[in-house]
Amino acid sequence: MSTDNPLLSDAPLPAFSKIRAADIGPAIDMILADYQSGIDAITTPAASRDFDYVMLEQERLDQRLSRAWAPVSHLHAVADTPELRAAYEQAEEKITDFASGLGQNRDLYAAVQAVADGPGFVQRTRPERALVEHALRDFRLSGVALEEPARTRFREIANELSKLTTAFSNAVLDATDAWQERIEDERDLSGIPESGRAVLREYARERDLNGWLVTLKQPSVQAVLTYADSRSLRERVYWAYQTRASDQGPNAGKFDNSERMEKILALRHEAAQLLGFANSAEESLATKMAKTPGEVLAFLRDLIARARPVAQRELEELREFARSELQIENLEAWDVAYASEKLRLARYALDEEQLKAYFPLPSVLDGMFQVARRLYGITVAPVAKSVDVWHPDVRFCELRDASGKPIAAVYLDLYARSGKRGGAWMDVCRARFHDGSDVQLPVAFLTCNFAPPAAGRPSLLTHDDVQTMFHEFGHGLHHMLTRIDLPSIGGIDGVEWDAVELPSQFMENFCWNRKALDLFARHWSSDARLPDELFDKMLAARHFQAGMFLCRQLEFGLFDFLVHADYDPTRGARVMETLEAARREAAVLYPPAWQRFPHAFTHVFAGGYAAGYYSYLWAEVLSADVFGAFEESAGEEGDVIDATVGARFRNEILSVGASRPALESFIAFRGRAPQPDALLRSYGLAA
């Protein structure tokens, strides 16, 4: 095979430094042509209807496409350029159209159905049967049974949605990069700690500017809204951040996602109805643990009923504190983080800046890897050899089993920078695949947006940042520790969307455990362990404003579900109207009328969480209950890093992927069904 084009190489890892925008189109064209030839061979009437020929061959074809597309998609998210974006969008359109055609290929559907109907099917392994069952379900959800003109229309919708969601995400990225405010007088930064100022100074230096540069990157927004004494600066940053890509704010109309949201919701609804569903919320549940919209809404509203009274009390306490101690008569949205930090400091004497000194990024990484070693008997360490990466800050680590044998790898890209999508995520670079010859080992991308090292200090993380890191590593372990050899149902692929957050949220619990913290909570300059006094304060403050936080998540989840479930073609999307309705049910603090949160809600309008944001809380029930098993084994020492329970968790949940239903895997581990009260206990809200 030609290796002139790096995207056509069979090398174990992508050659990131060699990938050019001009490589993308030719590589994808060639791979899709070969893919189609492979499908044509499978679907010829004389072809075998054997599992290996029909199913394994599809996995091989799909993996070749994935090996090329995964690095391209990743570069689009972390190293965006106009040329790359244009090439990505053109290729994405071709891939989406190809995938739509594949999902509606009746000859291929018949071939897969023939495998399921074959005499030897019941003797196949559980993962092999699951692969076939998932494929048949996905054919039905792709409109394979539709007749013309609905069949063509469904395919058109898929292509249009792909373009719109990409455009939505690009608009958010562009809007984030488009606003900045230069600060020349350091007095305007009063209240912002030195670590935060260092980040703002670094942003200015990158642009050859003197002074400090406030941007809409997460470290900057967090520093200003949490610490800046200047109320006007907080308001300006909040205004710019909360109106990104909308009809409001400093760049009103320039990157506006309003029309895109209207079209996205209309098309999702139309596609769902073509498939026979009442709405796109109902359609989304075809691949989730929850089975009906009523079940999801009852779940959310039950939590609202329990959390909202607590949140209302918390907000009144905050308002009173702001009035009496900060002379803020009317608490506004841009005051909340600032006043909350002051209240937390007053109540618990917990200084977040003091705490950050004990979470230097290198130490946190090392400790996180030690937790994984003690739980699962694996080692995670940087590789000695040079590996091709897309930015000098990127690290590459290998996972090895107890015998020292490599089993997986992960790229770590952890610092915020221009041209990089905000937030934190794990994505697949390579999936585990064994087709009887060589084994392709799983490789993950782990991406965060932490403040980079500055002023001679390493990157210092907030405790929330530490939890974010553990969360994404939990996703990574789910992907990397799979023992399933079939990529479509291995790792996170194919797992019900409202269960996929279980392994990630589970890992967050170790950030609150003394034994685990002792592995990595060390002062960046003195190497002193986290003092007991500081740990006790941290623990005491753990559930500070838990009701307000939970209500905010419930507001997001309810808005997302209602905007899909209640869509009415005669009335349009009613995005802001639906958000107001969700706030009336779930919120305790109402932002200004000009706030445009949905316009940058990429999880729902450009990610996989459409009618699925509730999944975070649903999975949190599962993860809290799972962690309960570790707490039960901890004994008086409180050591929850139990290798025996860890091995059971790995064997029953992490490693089985989607080879069986998530509920079945949960029961295999816990010995019973999930208990919803586990979530309330984890928030300190249980009666």
Please give the residue ranges for each predicted region.
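His/Asp/Glu-rich acidic catalytic environments and adjacent acidic regulatory segments
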Residues: S2-M30, Y35, A77, L84-K291, ...
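Active-site-proximal, well-structured secondary-structure segments within enzyme catalytic domains
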Residues: P127, L131-E133, R155, E160-K163, ...
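Short pre-active-site segment immediately N-terminal to the catalytic Zn-binding motif
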Residues: A451-F470
